[in-house]
Structure formats: structure tokens, C-alpha cells
Amino acid sequence: MEKYHGLEKIGEGTYGVVYKAQNSDGESFALKKIRLEKEDEGIPSTVSIREISILKELRHSNIVKLYDVIHAKKRLILVFEHLDQDLKKLIDVCDGGLESVTAKSFLLQLLNGIAYCHEHRVLHRDLKPQNLLINREGELKIADFGLARAFGIPARRYTHEVVTLWYRAPDILMGSKKYSTPIDIWSVGCIFAEMVNGRPLFPGVSETDQLMRIFKILGTPNSQNWPDVFKLPKYDPNFPVYEPLPWETFIKGLDDTGIDLLSKMLKLDPNQRITAKQAIEHPYFKETN
């Protein structure tokens, strides 16, 4: 820690306190101080250490770079590149949603970063606008990649704030333990819709409410649109039956190709969701440099 000074607290995230600091050359970094779950004799979880070492190997222009891991007494300190703004703040100040060209650029960058990590068998598991950082050049970078795998998604955040359910896939909400790449794609779809609409698509207040909000818009799953849904632990055959709404009734300012892409991301059945690599090749991006 001696090489960093001028610590300024800039936030409290899912896993700990985040500080802005400088090194001796005046370069800015984001330091995440993470409390570790202890194993025997107070030794940090070997799983945590192993997972974080994998993150250090990830190198992509759309992923926040992890420069260093400092092993302190009861915590790990992760040293990341520092960016000033996150996507949530940007959406909040842009009343009515982002401009279409901006939303398209951010979505493509997000998919590029996601595709890279999925190719390297790393999942995010906790994608949301707060985890997407943006610099002054309009570059989007994904933060906290892999931390959910390393430390688990806690029921409550470090700040005692309930972890948001708004971007969580219906298969996970119904108890699926098969964490794979489609859970990140669902989150990307929710973020895409939020960039376009200027507000969250499924702002649930509990797991049950979250599912009902999804079903009221996309329809209740059945044997036709999701053959394996009955196998999920929290599936209830007595779920209220809703028919899917027309996309144009709840998505504003998106053309037909954009709606087609979004609909492929927000498939109820995870096996039917588009992959990040496939999404990058979608016609929606054909006019994007």
C-alpha cells in the first residue's frame, strides 16, 4: 500500500469500500478493499485468491484492468484502473434514454467485453449499469468481472443495501444452479432496454415480484417456450398466466432490428438466448464503426 497515497473514498460496492488513490507518478487508480471470508486459522479463501489471479490475466479494451492484488491482514486490496463515471449516472442525467447512436456504441462495447470473457470461461454474474464505467472518450469498460465467482453474490451489499434483482435472469430467480453464459446475456438485454427507455425494464422489489414483472411483459413460461422450466426448484405450476406484450408497447425509440436483437437476449429459456459473439454479428450493428 505504500506506493499509493491520497486515498479518497468514492463508493461502497457489493464487496467492499472503493477508494481513489494516486501512485508516485500521479496516476489515478481505484482501490477495492475486499473483506475475505476466512477458512481455518484465518487464511483467505484459496478459491478467492485463485479466481482473482485469473482476472489479472484478462486484457481487453472493454474490461477494467486489474493491475495489482495486495494481500493485507483481513482483506484483499484490488488495484484497478480508475474511470470517473458509470452508466447508471449517465442514464440518470439523460432524461428519456440515451441517444440511439450512443446506446448502440455502448452495447457493442459491452458485448465485445462479455464475448472476450466468455471465451476465456469467465462469467460476470452481476452485470448492471453501476458496473459499467465510461471515460471521456466514450469508451465503456466492465468492472467487477469475475468477482461474483470469486466471492459469491451476497444477499446484501457491503452497505446493507439489498443486491439488485433487476438484471437477474428468470432461470436464476427460479433456482437454477447452472451458472453459464446466458445469465450474463439476460443482464445485457436488461441494460440495453434501460439505455433505450431511460428506466429499468424489470424493477422488482423481491424475487417473486421480479419474476412476475418479467412474466407480465414477456409472458409466463410454458412447455412450448421453455421445455425444461418445470425442472427448476422454484417453478410453480400455479404461476399466473400472462400473454407476452408487443415489444413496441414497452420499448421506445428502437427500430425493428434493435427489437429483434433485444428479443433474442431476453428469451425466457436460457438455451434459446443469443450468445455475445452472435449478438456482435447482428444486423443492428451493421452501420456501427
Curated annotation (Swiss-Prot):
Protein kinase domain residues: 4-285
Modified residues (Phosphotyrosine): Y15
Reactions performed catalytically: L-seryl-[protein] + ATP = O-phospho-L-seryl-[protein] + ADP + H(+); L-threonyl-[protein] + ATP = O-phospho-L-threonyl-[protein] + ADP + H(+); [DNA-directed RNA polymerase] + ATP = phospho-[DNA-directed RNA polymerase] + ADP + H(+)
Family: Belongs to the protein kinase superfamily. CMGC Ser/Thr protein kinase family. CDC2/CDKX subfamily.
Enzyme active site: D126
Organism of origin: Plasmodium yoelii yoelii
Binding-site residues for ATP, renumbered to this chain: I10, G11, E12, G13, T14, Y15, G16, V17, V18, K32
InterPro entries in the record: CDK, Kinase-like_dom_sf, Prot_kinase_dom, Protein_kinase_ATP_BS, Ser/Thr_kinase_AS
Needed co-factor(s): Mg(2+)
PROSITE patterns listed in its UniProt record: PROTEIN_KINASE_ATP (PS00107), PROTEIN_KINASE_DOM (PS50011), PROTEIN_KINASE_ST (PS00108)
Keywords, comma-separated and alphabetical: ATP-binding, Cell cycle, Cell division, Cytoplasm, Kinase, Magnesium, Metal-binding, Mitosis, Nucleotide-binding, Phosphoprotein, Serine/threonine-protein kinase, Transferase
SUPFAM superfamilies: Protein kinase-like (PK-like)
Protein name: Cyclin-dependent kinase 2 homolog
